[in-house]
Amino acid sequence: MNIRTIVIEGHEQDVKISRTERGAEVTIEQHTRRAGKQDICIAHIARDENRESRYAKATEVAKVVYGTDCRGRAAATNSMVHEVLNEMERVAGC
């Protein structure tokens, strides 16, 4: 069974994780007057990437999902970042 897309309800906007040929792509939806709706990619996850690299990308995605603190870090605990990483890896097929 392959999961193609997962949508996570974020702090201010939803985060969409979609399966690609090489792994997964994490996007957010942005609305502009000129272009209308656009999907902005915030991370690419390759199946053959090492775990540290995927964790660093999950930390950046967690900033969008959970918001940031006053220092600009993700307002999430380590286990919350691991939950985001787990969903990204499920879609990518890691």
Outline where the language-model segments fall.
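Amphipathic, interaction-prone secondary-structure segments
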Residues: 2-40
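Mixed-charge, Lys/Arg-enriched low-complexity segments
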Residues: 3, 37-94
